[in-house]
Every structure is written in C-alpha cells, then in structure tokens.
From Swiss-Prot:
CDD domains (UniProt xref): Hint (cd00081)
Gene behind the chain: hh
Gene Ontology molecular function terms on file: calcium ion binding; cholesterol-protein transferase activity; morphogen activity; patched binding; peptidase activity
Gene Ontology BP terms: anatomical structure morphogenesis; cell fate specification; cell-cell signaling; intein-mediated protein splicing; protein autoprocessing; regulation of gene expression; segment polarity determination; self proteolysis
Lineage: Eukaryota, Metazoa, Ecdysozoa, Arthropoda, Hexapoda
E.C. code: 3.1.-.-
UniProt site (Involved in cholesterol transfer): 295
Lipid attachment points (Cholesterol glycine ester): 249
Organism for this UniProt entry: Drosophila willistoni (Fruit fly)
Protein localization: Nucleus; Cytoplasm
Binding residues annotated for Ca(2+) 1, in chain numbering: 141-142, 147, 178
Protein name listed in UniProt: Protein hedgehog
Lipid group attachment sites (N-palmitoyl cysteine): 77
Length: 469
C-alpha cells in the first residue's frame, strides 16, 4: 500500500488547509505583480501560514475528540430513582404458608419485638392514625371504625399497596378485614393490638389473586408478610419508634476498641489520629488510624442489636450497621446488616491468645435500648469493637461501595497529615501560655456533614435492594 495512504486524517486536513492558503497567497502575489506594486515576500509571512495550517489540524482534532466524548455510551446507577422508563420487574406470587422474610415475625430482621398492647385509654393511643383512603374498603365488623386505626408506618405501606392493587387489577380494590383490635380476637402476641398488623384481601374475594396480593404487599414495604390462609393475607410492620430511631450505624459509647499499645479504650474517649485494631483487606488484623467520626452523640437514646457469641464476646450495634459474617461452607466473608444476623451464624472475633481473627458462633440475638452513639471511621473501613470485627459503615449492604464513597475523606485526611500541626504554627510567646485543648471528636455532636450528605442522596442513586429499610 502507498505510504501516503497511511497518513493520519489530521495530516490530510493540514495539507488541504495549506494548499488553500497557498492558492490564495499565489493569487494575491500575481495581482500585485500585474499592478506594478513591490512585493515584500518575507519568510515570517510564510511561517505564519504554516502555523495557521497546524492550528487548523489541532482544531479538527479537538472537535473530533469532543464529539466522541459527547456521544460515548453512558453508564448509570440503576434502578434507583431517576428519569426514564422503569425497568419491568417479574413478580412471582407467594405460595400458601410462605412468609417473607423467612424469619419469625418478632425477630429484628422482620417486624421486631412486641412493645405492648395499646388500649383506648393508653397514652400511646394518640399515636394511632385513621386511614380514610378511598381506594381501600374497610370491613369494620365492629362498627367502631377500629379497622381504620393503625400506626403511621402501617398506613404508609397500606396506601402503597392499595395503589399497586388498582394497577394490577383495574376495578379491584384492597380490602382490610382487620387492623387495630381491642376485642382480643387474636393470639396473645398479635401485633393487631398495637396497630402494626393488618389482615387483607381483595373486595372481589377472588382467592386466586391472593398469592400475588401477598407479593404486592412485600413490594409495598411491609416488614413481614404471611400467606397464612387461602382466605386472607397477614401483614405487619416495625414500630414507629424503631423506624425513627437511628437510621445510621453506630456503637454504644462504652464499647471498647484495642489501641496499638494493647490498651482497651472506650469509643467515647477515642480521638482522631488514634490507631485501633481493625481488619485489613487481606483479612488479617491491622492497626488503622481513626480519621473522623461518622456520628457522635453521647446523649441520644437508641435501639441496638446485641450479638452474643459462644466465646463470650458481646457486640452492641445499631440495626443498620454492617457486621462481618463468616460462611464456613464457602469459606467466604460477607457483610450483613446487624438486624439480619441470626443465631448459628459466625462472626470474626479477635483471639486474645494468638491475636488472630477467628470465627465464633452467634448463640443469641437480642435488642436493647441504650444511651449514646459513636461511629468512628478508620482508614481501613473496619474496626474491632468488643473483640468482634465490624464494618465502619451502615445502611448500604456493600462494604466496598461504602468504602469507595468515603475515599474523599481519606484523601482529605492524608492531605491534612502533610500540613504542619497547629502547635507548630504558634509563636514562642503564645506557646508559653497555658491552653486547654479540645479534640475535634469531643467538639462533634451529631452526624458528620459528609456522611449526612451521602445518606441523603442514597435513595436517589442506589436500588432499594441495596439499602437498609
């Protein structure tokens, strides 16, 4: 093949521009000679035209590059909220006696523990709200309107389900057979007495729809759904107090971390810059620097999950926090929300004799109410608290994604470490005066601004299945 055919398009464009300029320059030169004018044909003027042709090629290159970047295919996070048509999801009906999730109703991963019956004369009765949704048929066998009363969370999920029912079966409406109950027609541990449960069907009483109705209830956000009978579906939700409690991930202030010198230090006394025992990316113990506190509030009352292991370790943490769970069958380590850790699961615990991180079986999972929350963030993104390996992250069920999201804070911490300390910037006279230092950790009261920003945008960029609900 001819060597000229191997030239780049930009060179061809430059030659074209050069030939056009040469023709124009030659024509002007001939006209000047014919008119008798003296022509000053300087080398500088020739160089100017050559430079012009080079700029022409550069401009064409930049134009093509911009066009390529403009029309490159975009990769977006989905299927979270955003513009465009929603992806079609295949829904499968539940089968008779199936429950979602496959847990006991009163476990933390489902609707949670009982909080006590709410009679009409109870101070908590005012927390129940009536539901006047016209798209819902309330059976109201008692004639007192009791079936319209429920908790705020239950009403929210029920209204969402009513909308789904109308979309699934036009002309059919959701039927509420039972909601809050004051006549004790159910079992002793029924959530109907707290307004947290509903028994539902469809107003056309078509029993063939009830398997799909149960699936729609799951999609609507009910915390526990049971296809308990061919004649009705049972749904329940967490209490309003548990859902408005801490939605982030924290430990209790009295929980301890191991310092590099072997000392056990309460999390409430940790400071930025402390090096605490963590787990490295290779699964081995490593000491990592505390770079900030995602949250710190020593006065706030919160609900916690308490994990007890067969080795005596006890970890107290908020439900949305990520815990490392060892899978002995597959020999893999996964991160699971604390309220979804079950008995007989394995968590990694620091062995005081060997110093290694070894799996221990969870023998009991309980819930406690305690005061204060502390959430230190280490450079590794993990921390060993009360000898149990835990993540520094919460709410999102991906340790790697959460760690990537905090990369700017790690970079900022690294840059700050290169800057001179405040004490080095003081003058000699001011250094002789007594001063009282207050650490940034002690000054902080509440959620860190960057962590709060991430929590706010998560609903718009992450799928619901990735988030703690």
């Amino acid at each position: 093949m001819d060597s000229q055919s191997n030239q780049t398009p930009w060179a061809s464009a430059s030659v074209t521009c050069l030939s056009l300029d040469a023709k124009r320059h030659s024509q002007c030169l001939d006209d000047a000679i014919k008119s008798g004018h003296q022509v000053n044909y300087s080398p500088a003027r020739s160089l100017r035209y050559i430079a012009y042709t080079q700029r022409c090629g550069i401009r064409l290159t930049m134009l093509m590059l911009i066009m390529c970047l403009t029309f490159m295919p975009a990769h977006s996070c989905g299927p979270g909220r955003g513009l465009g048509r929603r992806r079609v999801q295949n829904l499968y009906p539940l089968v008779l006696k199936q429950t979602v999730p496959n847990l006991s109703e009163h476990q933390l991963g489902a609707s949670g523990p009982l909080e006590g019956e709410i009679p009409r004369d109870s101070p908590k009765f005012k927390d129940l709200v009536p539901n006047y949704n016209r798209d819902i048929v309330f059976k109201d066998e008692e004639g007192t309107g009791a079936d319209r009363l429920m908790t705020k969370r239950c009403r929210e999920k029920l209204n969402a389900l009513a909308y789904s029912v109308m979309n699934e079966w036009p002309g059919v409406r959701l039927l509420v057979i039972e909601s809050w109950d004051e006549d004790h027609d159910h079992g002793q541990e029924s959530l109907h007495y707290e307004g947290r449960a509903v028994t539902i069907g469809t107003n056309d009483r078509d029993l063939s729809k009830y398997g799909m109705l149960a699936r729609l209830a799951v999609e609507a956000g009910f915390d526990w759904v049971s296809y308990v009978s061919r004649r009705h579906i049972y749904c329940s939700v967490k209490s309003d107090s548990s859902t408005i409690s801490h939605v982030h991930g924290c430990f209790t202030p009295e929980s301890t971390a191991q310092m590099e010198n072997g000392e056990k230090k309460p999390l409430s006394q940790l400071s930025i810059g402390d090096r605490v025992l963590s787990m490295g990316s290779n699964g081995q113990p490593v000491y990592s620097e505390v770079i900030l506190f995602m949250d710190r509030n020593l006065e706030q009352l919160e609900n916690f999950v308490q994990l007890h292991t067969d080795g005596g370790a006890v970890l107290t943490v908020t439900p949305a926090h990520l815990i490392s769970v060892w899978q002995p069958d597959s020999q893999q380590l996964n991160y699971v929300f604390a309220d979804r850790v079950e008995e007989m699961n394995y968590v990694l615990v620091n062995d005081v004799v060997t110093g290694e991180l070894l799996p221990q079986r969870v023998i009991k999972v309980t819930s406690v109410h305690s005061k204060g929350v502390v959430a230190p963030l280490t450079r590794e993104g993990t921390i060993v608290v009360n000898s149990v390996v835990a993540s520094c992250y919460a709410v999102i069920n991906s340790q790697s994604l959460a760690h990537w999201g905090l990369a700017p804070m790690r970079l900022l911490s690294s840059l700050q470490s290169l800057m001179p300390a405040k004490g080095q910037l003081r003058t000699t006279s001011s250094a002789t005066q007594p001063t009282k230092e207050v650490s940034r950790a002690e000054q902080q009261n509440g959620i860190h601004w960057y962590a709060n920003a991430l929590y706010k945008v998560k609903d718009y960029v992450l799928p619901k299945s990735w988030r703690h609900e």
